[in-house]
Each structure stands twice: as C-alpha cells, then as structure tokens.
C-alpha cells in the first residue's frame, strides 16, 4: 500500500520547472581535512591518526565549524595535547593531537590543510508553488580535493547572471561563467548525493512556465524532449534534446542519457557544460528529470536523473 500512496502524491504534484542559474555558498558542519602538511613526520595530526577526508567536528569538547576555530585552539594550546573529535564515514573517533612548534612562523600547528566552505554555480530544477521549496543540481556539492559530499551547516543562494561560456570539447568539459548578485534569494537546507535543496524568498521573475505535472520513472520514454537552461544573462532558453538508454531501476544520478540535438545550443556551448547541472527536462508536458553530468569523451551527451529520485530525497 505504501508504494501507491507515494505514486498518488506525485501524480497530483505540480511544480514550476526551473532552468534558472543560481549561486551557492556552502559552509560545512565541522571542517574537512583536505591535505596533510608535506613530510608526514611534520604533521602531528597525521601522526595521531587523522587522515584526508576526515571531518573534524570538535577539539577538546569545543565544536569547530571554521578554519579560524581550529587555528585559534591549536595556536593557543601551548603545545599541550588536544582531543580532536573526527567523523570518518559513519563512525566517530577521538585522536590525541599534540601541536608542533613551527619555527618559521613562530606558532603551534597541527600539520593539516582544512576547508570550511565552497561556492559555485548550478541550475534550479523545480520550485514547489505553495512553499517556494526548490531542488537543483541533480547531484551533490562535493569537495574539489577529496570528492566527498560536503556536510552542510548553512548555505545561501544568490541569483546569478551568466556572463560567458567556455565551450565543451572532447576530453575537456566546458563551463558557464557567471557572477553572483548582491542579494541572497534563499537558503540551502540540504546537500545530498542527488541534489541540493532549499527555500527561496520569492518566486524568480525569469520563470518561463506555469506549474506542470511531474512524470514518474515509468512514464519517461526514449525520444524527443526539451531542456530548460540559461546560457546568456538570466533568460531561460528551451532547447531540443533526445532521451535514450533509460534505466528505470536506477535511484541515482545516471538514470538515462541526454543528447543535445538543438543546433543553437551546440553552437553556443558545444553541448552540456558545467553549471548546467540541474537543468530540467520536459517531455510530453511533464517534468521528467534533470541533467546531472556531461560525458567527457562526448560533450553533446550527458546523464540525467529522474525527478522522482530528486523528490524522494527532498528533506
């Protein structure tokens, strides 16, 4: 019975398709270890057992969420051991780190490189009319060095104006270039492996469609569809694409293949480029999903995610 309930909810659901670029600033919960100081012997944290990809959540019982938090505690330690609370996968560990004296900089250090935030551009997939909740990107925001999903503490959403394009070539994905608007237009509430989710303060002016139904995965078919995306300023364009290789059992970010067939888009971008992730795909008047990845060896092709998967993971 549970399955039917889910289907009924989605059957009646109407959403605005997006295609609108947005800027994300994400601050992590805890700080992410992205590197070890050169020469492992000089890294007290490494010697204590801390590794790249670990997330440091507290030091000697004090929560840490920024590089400044960690630096302040380590530098004022006087070289006494500190208890680093670390999340690794699903487990939590405590490592006793004794900061070392750096004679070049005259201060105590733990010997690790850490990161506490990131920023980037993506595309909004859908907006729920009643609540202004949105989903976008169709994949998670991951750390550039470790490839791991970044744990979200807080995040803000800005509008973005697309100011240029680096065209995609075989072996070298292109990208949309843009600048963030001064105003925050919303906030992020979740960063998941199938997309980012948040709430907007108001309905964007550049929506180009009334709310439309969503397609369940069994309704998605091979053949023609339309991609909504923004490649110039903040005007959403509609471009023809083809859907193929549908894997209905896939609950992840590569559920079908999207091929760009529109000569205008191919001319402008060479195909799918970074920044387009989350661009909604409409087929038979329904929102079927979003573009998630470009194929490195053929930028005219990429992968898509079912809208059903994105909605199922919405917090």
Indicate residue ranges for each PLM-predicted region:
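Hydrophobic transmembrane alpha-helices and their immediate loop junctions
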Residues: 87, 91-92, 133, 282, ...
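Serine endopeptidase catalytic core focused on the charge-relay Asp
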Residues: 100-270, 274, 284, 292, ...
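PDZ domains, with a preference for the canonical peptide-binding region formed by the helix
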Residues: 58-91, 298-300, 304-309
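PDZ-domain C-terminal substructure recognizer with occasional recognition of PDZ-binding tails
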Residues: 2-10, 71-111
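Envelope-exposed proteins and targeting segments
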Residues: 3, 20-22, 27-32, 52, ...
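Conserved PDZ fold ligand-binding element
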Residues: 45-68, 281-284, 288-289, 293
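Signal peptide-directed extracytoplasmic domains
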Residues: 8, 12-40, 46-47, 92-100, ...
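Generic structural signal for buried aliphatic residues
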Residues: 56-57, 70, 82, 103, ...
């Amino acid at each position: 019975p549970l399955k039917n309930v889910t289907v009924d909810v989605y059957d009646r659901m109407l959403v605005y398709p997006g295609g609108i670029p947005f800027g994300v600033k994400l601050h992590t919960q805890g700080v992410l270890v992205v590197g070890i100081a050169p020469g492992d012997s000089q890294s007290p944290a490494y010697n204590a057992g801390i590794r790249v990809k670990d997330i440091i959540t507290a030091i000697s019982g004090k929560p840490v969420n920024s590089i400044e938090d960690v630096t302040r505690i380590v530098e004022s330690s006087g070289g006494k051991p500190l208890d680093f609370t670390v999340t690794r996968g699903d487990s939590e560990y405590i490592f006793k780190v004794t900061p070392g004296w750096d004679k070049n900089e005259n201060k105590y250090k733990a010997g690790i490189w850490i990161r506490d935030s990131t920023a980037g551009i993506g595309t909004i997939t859908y907006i729920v009319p009643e609540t202004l909740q949105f989903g976008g990107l169709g994949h998670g925001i991951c750390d550039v060095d470790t490839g791991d999903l970044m744990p979200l503490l807080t995040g803000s959403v800005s509008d973005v104006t697309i100011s240029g394009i680096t065209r995609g070539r075989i072996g070298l994905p292109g990208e949309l270039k843009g600048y963030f608007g001064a105003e925050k237009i919303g906030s992020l509430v979740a960063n998941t492996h199938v997309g980012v989710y948040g709430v907007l303060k108001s309905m964007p002016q550049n929506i180009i469609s009334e709310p439309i139904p969503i397609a369940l995965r069994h309704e998605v078919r091979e053949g023609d569809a339309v991609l909504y995306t923004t490649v110039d300023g903040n005007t959403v364009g509609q471009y023809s694409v083809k859907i193929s290789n549908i894997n209905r059992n896939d609950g992840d970010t590569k559920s079908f293949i999207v091929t760009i067939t529109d000569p205008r888009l191919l001319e402008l971008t060479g195909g799918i480029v970074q920044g387009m992730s989350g661009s909604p795909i409409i087929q038979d008047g329904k929102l079927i999903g979003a573009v998630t990845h470009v194929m490195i060896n053929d930028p005219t092709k990429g992968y898509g995610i079912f809208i059903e998967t994105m909605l199922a993971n919405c917090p």
